[in-house]
Amino acid sequence: MKAIVYTSNTGSAAQYAALLAKETALPVYSLAEAVKKLPRGTEILYVGWLMAGTVKGYKKAAKRFAVQAVCAVGMFETGTQTEYVRKTNKLPPELPLFTLQGNLDRNKLHGLYRLMIDIMRKGVTKG
């Protein structure tokens, strides 16, 4: 692998990407930066945040780069939901997938995502 590329919404995916970059000595780029700086076909580790099982930014990253592994950061416990995430994103069975638990900071969510979380929270606390 040549680089770590990430998409983050509330910062958890960016934090995991930075941690991985520190441990591997690989450069780290947001997906927007990577599109400008890395050549097509570069082998990358992709770190993206999860929304309803979809790894945000994965499709774009996979079209441009050679994704060697995926880290999906979401609300569930680390190591869970892997089959669901793999199926939802149509990840090949041979592609390593790691699910990681992130932080949910409602104040960092934008627009529709914040509204969806508010609705979910009301439903959960109602019971």
Residue ranges and their predicted role:
Residues L50-G127:
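FMN-binding flavodoxin-like domain, especially the glycine-rich phosphate-binding loop
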